[in-house]
Curated annotation (Swiss-Prot):
One of the primary rRNA binding proteins, it binds directly to 16S rRNA central domain where it helps coordinate assembly of the platform of the 30S subunit. This is Small ribosomal subunit protein uS8. The keyword rRNA-binding applies. The gene is rps8. Belongs to the universal ribosomal protein uS8 family. Keywords: Ribonucleoprotein, Ribosomal protein, RNA-binding, rRNA-binding.
Length: 130
């Protein structure tokens, strides 16, 4: 079986584990992109600690959940956003203003839309979380 979108799979694993009340979950396969998204989610306070575990294959992430994720998901296709168009995408993917976050990949790395707006840079949408 071929895994077409590892990021979407990782985010749905987190969402499902939160929905049934688990305190941790395992994400496999691991990638740098998934690790960067997890780091942004951790900085925003949606997940606790996470660690990379080398299993001899692609590796796995062990994620500690804190019960703050209501919904999260990958955004497909990866829409390009400019510095002035964040509000349009916030209205489309987030339930209310200043509630939740869009995760964006930029030339300066993966960050939330708040950080990208502060630095005045655009990029491509990866995911949303609230």
């Amino acid at each position: 079986m071929v895994l077409l979108d590892p990021l979407a799979n990782a985010l749905s694993t987190i969402k499902n584990a939160e929905a049934i009340g688990k305190s941790s979950c395992i994400i496999r396969p691991a990638s740098k992109n998934i690790g960067n998204v997890l780091k942004v989610m951790q900085d925003l306070g949606y997940i606790g600690e996470f660690e990379f575990i080398d299993d001899g294959k692609a590796g796995i992430y062990s994620v500690t959940l804190v019960g703050r994720v209501n919904k999260c998901g990958a955004i497909k296709p990866r829409y390009s956003v400019g510095t002035g168009s964040f509000e349009r995408w916030e209205k489309q993917f987030l339930p209310a203003k200043n509630f939740g976050a869009l995760i964006i990949t930029t030339s300066s790395g993966v960050m939330s839309q708040y950080e990208a707006r502060e630095k005045k840079i655009g990029g491509q949408l990866l995911a949303y979380v609230y």
